[in-house]
Amino acid sequence: FQAEDGIRDIGVTGVQTCALPIYKAIWIIYLFLCLISIVEVFSASSTLTYKSGDHWGPITNHLTLLMVGTIAVWIVHNIPCRWFKTFIALLPISWALLIAVFVIGALTNGAKRWIDLGFIQFQPSEVAKMATIITVAFILSRMQEENGANKKAFKYICGITVTTCGLIVTENLSTAVLLAGSVFLLMFVGRVPFKQLGLLAGIGFACIIIGIGTIKYIPGEVWDKIGLHRMVTWQSRLNNHFDESEIPAAKFDIDNDAQIAHANIAIASSHILGKGPGNSVQRDFLSQAFSDFIYAIIIEELGLVGGAFVAILYILLLMRIAKIARNCDKSYYIFLVTGIGILFVLQATFNMLVAVGIMPVTGQPLPLISKGGTSTLVNCVYIGMILSISRYVNDLKRQQAEELLAQQTEQSQEVAPENNIIPQEKSV
């Protein structure tokens, strides 16, 4: 990497061609994810249908949100990517909104994460994640030196990330962990010195061990008394995940234990091709079948083939993002698109690992597939930003092709007159 406006020495060389342009491939992946979302959310929303008494209400709302999201993709896609730096202003705004959540936040599923706007519940943590990634990418691009990122970049990035995660963690531990992990990987890509990354990894590992021990062994009554009610939920999830013994009926937590059990049943009964779209049985027993556990419903209905196909879509998206970064000539765009890709795919990985029982329940939705409000719209903005940077790369390659063609034409014109000179015969 060079400085902000420099050319990467491993950047575009010559004119590269591919069978399918990057931006078209990303559009196709996006549309596939939306199509799967429509089918599976419609199937998995049976609990919402029972509660509301409206068969078409949940899917109509979801379709409307996807349409608004697609419009957002198109709008952001047409914004020149140099303007994305202005989105850094969202960082202090998101911090203020996260503080406001503690005061006026709506309590949903035992957590204060949303601000109720009437027509939609707004989740400031989603905006905070986006603003943090944009800001970190900007800092890394501005502080690149010949041998890597300036050591001060590490301090600035840690300060911003700790502030954001600190405002999120009390009500949404998994989102804070997701953001911290994404920033760490982005710093690795941004060539932050290994000594600093190693120190951060050691501190992070120690905090995880201490945090798990603290949450696991301090009685829930203590957490309730000091107002940290979410600790009780985390304690239950950790105990359920690591404890293989049978849970007594008196201690059975319907919200967590039953969901995990029914998700396991959904996957175990799926086989290769599944039961077919709309034929899920466990959706009627999973209260979050349309969100946290939608991947289990996908596997139940579409089988292992369908589950693998969804995972491959996210892998292909990450590969396309890597290709955009490899062909880009500006370090800010490289770090921004890479950070978005890491955050997007890491969140999908969290959701999938929870559904198959490898991780404790986190509450992270499956990007662009789970039913959601703010998360869906912000994910659509991510896709729009990726497409905008992809368009910049395409324009760059086109410009390079034109310059190369002009250079070859000029060289051929210089050589042509020399070849047309006819030597004169010597007079005798």
Where are the model-predicted features located?
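Transmembrane helix boundary and interhelical junction motifs in multipass membrane proteins
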Residues: N172-V177, K275-G278, F290-S291, M359-T362, ...
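Transmembrane alpha-helices of multi-pass inner-membrane enzymes
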Residues: L35, G357-E402
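Short clusters of hydrophobic/aromatic residues that line enzyme substrate/ligand-binding pockets
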Residues: I7, I115, I272-L273, P277, ...
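Alpha-helical transmembrane segments of integral membrane proteins, especially early/N-terminal helices
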Residues: P21-Y30, L90-S94, A261-I272
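Hydrophobic alpha-helical transmembrane segments of multi-pass inner membrane proteins, especially
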Residues: W27, L31-S43, S52-D255, A296, ...
